[in-house]
Amino acid sequence: MAHKPKKAACPSRAANRKKNTNSAHLEADISPWTEALFAAEILMLHATPVYYGFGVPRGDGSGVVIIPGFLGTDLYLMELHGWLQRIGYRSYFSGIGINAECPNLLVQRQLNQTIERALTETERKIHLIGHSLGGVIARSVAGQRPQDIASVITLAAPIRGTATSRTIRHAADAIRQRILREHGRGVLPDCYTGSCTCNFVDSLKRDIPRSMVETAIYTRDDGIVDWHYCMTGNREVDFEVPGTHIGMAFNPSAYAVVAERLARAQSSE
């Protein structure tokens, strides 16, 4: 069975932990080796009733756009896509290709087209689900298009900043240099950093309207990013599950939370 998700710790205590911890300590606390356990999460998912749609609220046919994480493609979200279809939603892959590009361009050139198609075909507001960097993108789009989004769900997404393993940081730096070389003046000088002044970064600072259901699912065993950054600080929004960062896309406990939160968004419309 899927583990019952736990609500986040008191926001004030989480904020104090974050305030008193420097970036060097944050990096030291991250252990990428635990991520090898994600394969067990896939096996566990297939052994749970949740995966087959039992014991979770049914969908209403509304559209759900799913967005892959850093260096990922829609392909690894096949399990999530199929599961959403089974429980009654119309699932859409993001169509962004490899998530290794300026996020602002990905949203403008690919993701917005997928969102428009989902809105047209379902004739109602849609839901966004993003894993890791895909969750940051989902949160940004929710800030840009609140009139079109019923709910936004982030899975192990560093929505409050980045503190990651050294390997991931080096990979991100290499991608940033490639983006600057390929696009030149087509992107801002601080592209692919939190200091960028593009619409993508700016929209992350906007508040989510109360009419939109927001959910941030995180794991304390995250071996890629510091889990504190995957929380909003709101106990009604943050949900802790056991598991790994990579495995969050296959995590039965996370799936159970997703189903409940999507159902809540239905009742809120």
Show where each model-derived region lies:
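Phenylalanine-focused residue identity feature
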Residues: 38, 54, 70, 92-93, ...
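Detector for Asparagine
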Residues: 16, 20-22, 99, 104, ...
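Generic hydrophobic, helix-prone segments enriched in Leu/Val/Ile
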Residues: 39-46, 111, 171-172, 227
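Serine-dependent carboxylesterase/thioesterase catalytic core
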Residues: 63-75, 79, 85-95, 99-203
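Helical cap/lid subdomain of alpha/beta-hydrolase-fold lipid enzymes
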Residues: 27, 143-269
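Short secondary-structure boundary micro-motifs
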Residues: 40, 48, 60, 136, ...
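Flexible, membrane-associating and regulatory peripheral segments of lipid-active enzymes
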Residues: 1-65, 71-82, 87, 93, ...
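Amphipathic, alpha-helical segments enriched in basic
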Residues: 42, 52-55, 59, 66, ...
